[in-house]
Amino acid sequence: MLNRPSSPDGGEAHAWPPDPEIPVFANAEHAHRRPLRWMFALVAVALSCLLATGIWRSRAAPPHAATQTVAPAGQALPPGRIFTVHPREPEPAPLPDMPAAPDPILPQPRPAPPVPPPPIRAPYDYDEPAPRRDSAALKSGPAMMVATAARLGQTERAGMADDGVSADAATLIGRNVSRATRSGGRDYRLLPGTFIDCILQTRIVTNVPGLTTCIVSRDVYSASGKRVLVPRGTTVVGEYRADLAQGSQRIYVAWSRLFMPSGLTIELASPAVDGTGAAGLPGVVDDKFAQRFGGALLLSVLGDATSYMLARATDARHGVNVNLTAAGTMNSLAASALNNTINIPPTLYKNHGDQIGILVARPLDFSILRGTNE
């Protein structure tokens, strides 16, 4: 067990154990120099840190650090954002006052020549149509009704002239201008467009033209609806034509006169219509196909059969001419037969007892019944 040497003042010595090769005074001097070395080392480390910090800050600073601004304490900006203040650009010099450009002077347009007003023409100024000559063709069918309407127009114009119209109105009357008139006596008048129900009494066959009759099946009242002017049982007489065209399905019938049971008669001159008001009367149409084409077909077949039989019965040298002659003869006969029968008109059949209608085409005046009990 070694004992530590004590200091002269009774304390323990600083160096333990003493180096036997170093003198005692050398150990004491070495002990006094050790704190100074530590101090110099700490100062060197601090200076190195300060130098390294300065170098890092100088490298991390932006190139225009001199133009950076520091915001006030209360308006601190978030870190990492740098704002640069650029110098204010000088204001541009004011432009000198320029005189205003004068307004361009445009050439004045030339005035257009005045347009003359259109000539003033009298109303309904048109030429008088040439009068049609009355002939036998006007006495049947639509032509008969046109002639009747023309006569009625002349009578109406004559009545207006008798009433004492002005000179202008007389001028208009001469130009076939219709004037509004007040029809009197509606209790004794049938107006155009009145429908009369009728039952056909005779059969119609259009091979030849002829007459036909029908019986009124329902009372016909006046324009006012207060009086029966055409009673049931009135007989109506009309006529039909035989010129039914190819493809037609209706026959035209013109009713000419009414015969009432009381003995009164009146001219009618109105067309026949079907139950719906369509013009003409429908019926069963026979187009006569067999009569028109049967003879030609038969002759054509006979010609082919004759040619075939002659070709088999004659020899090879002389049979050719005979065959051609027979074929040509049969073809000529077939063409002639077709020309004679192709224009046969069809026939329409309309049975008696069928319900038909009559459409009144002009005003009918029954003033003769005034004051009677008819």
UniProtKB/Swiss-Prot annotation:
Q: Does the keyword Transmembrane apply?
A: yes
Any idea what job this protein has?
Component of the type IV secretion system ptl required for secretion of assembled pertussis toxin (PTX) through the outer membrane.
Q: Which UniProt keywords apply?
A: Cell membrane, Membrane, Transmembrane, Transmembrane helix, Transport
| Name of the gene this protein is made from | ptlG
Which residues does the annotated region (Disordered) include? 86-117
Q: Where are the transmembrane segments?
A: 38-56
One Pfam family here: TrbI
**What is the protein name given in its UniProt record?**
Type IV secretion system protein PtlG
Q: What is the membrane topology noted in the UniProt record heading this document?
A: Single-pass membrane protein
Give the Pro residues compositional bias ranges: 92-117
Is the Metal-binding keyword given for this protein?
no
Q: Where in the cell is it found?
A: Cell membrane
Q: What induces it?
A: Cotranscribed with ptxABCDE. Activated by the two-component regulatory system BvgS/BvgA.
Q: Which InterPro entries match?
A: T4SS_VirB10/PtlG (IPR047695), T4SS_VirB10/TraB/TrbI (IPR005498), T4SS_VirB10/TrbI (IPR042217)
Would you tell me the Gene Ontology cellular component terms?
plasma membrane
Family that this chain belongs to: Belongs to the TrbI/VirB10 family.
